[in-house]
Amino acid sequence: MTELGGRVALVTGAGRRVGRALAVALGARGMHVLVHYNASSDGADETARLVTRAGGSAEVFRADLAVVAEAERMVDQLVATRGALDVLVNSAALMLRTPVGETSVTDWDAMFALNVRAAYFLSQRAAPALRASRGSIINIADLAAFETWPAYVPHGMTKAAVVQMTRALARVLAPEIRVNAIAPGVVLLPEGWSEADAEHLRGTTPLRRLGAPEDVVGAMLYLLDAGYVTGEVLTVDGGRHVRS
């Protein structure tokens, strides 16, 4: 197991849902965690409390990651104050229902700005510090990168881009930095989905349940400990990818 105690992590979108679980798990390994948020200030404060309670330390930082300068400033400030960066988790994402024929340029741009552009420029800015620490980048992709979801075509396209980015950066940044991704299935029910939607998903998933944040946490911890793994996209979807 990799010793993470006292090391430094940055988790984007850590104010709620899966991002919070990832941040708290890193705290439980003794890390100092920068809890990034944009709109969920109270949620970020709660995440920081949970990180501390788990045995780590935390700070919160607000940034609109769609603005590259804000994303870069967050990395710069963390490295300047802590002196290092060991783990970057690109978890922040935007998933909008955008059926073909109803997709607006505004929604398209918002998803690509956060899901793809922000993750790339954060990784680029963090690379010198991660190289010095022989650190790791973990990107949160999505099963939608490999499946076709008719009402979420642009979202799936952004996650396919995250997969390609992961593989390319793994090659470019080796050997000092490992870059991997996690492609979850449905982990927690997306906002606006009904219990009927949930039941349908359970019935079409081989393991007959939805995912939990802890499932993604387990994948993240494996990838952090797996020193001979890079460029991997670990699918965590209850077996949905083997249905066909």
Q: What spans do the regions from the language model cover?
A:
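Substrate-binding pocket helix/loop in short-chain dehydrogenase/reductase
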Residues: 99-100, 107-109, 193, 201
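Conserved NAD(P)H cofactor-binding loop of Rossmann-fold oxidoreductase domains
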Residues: 91-96, 238-239
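C-terminal substrate-recognition "lid" of short-chain dehydrogenase/reductases
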Residues: 129, 212-236, 241
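Catalytic Tyr-X3-Lys loop
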Residues: 94, 101-120, 138, 155-158, ...
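The beta1-alpha1 cofactor-binding region of Rossmann-like NAD(H)/NADP(H)-dependent oxidoreductases
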Residues: 41, 62-73, 105, 214-215
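Conserved glycine-rich Rossmann-like NAD(P)H-binding loop of the short-chain dehydrogenase/reductase
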Residues: 31-46
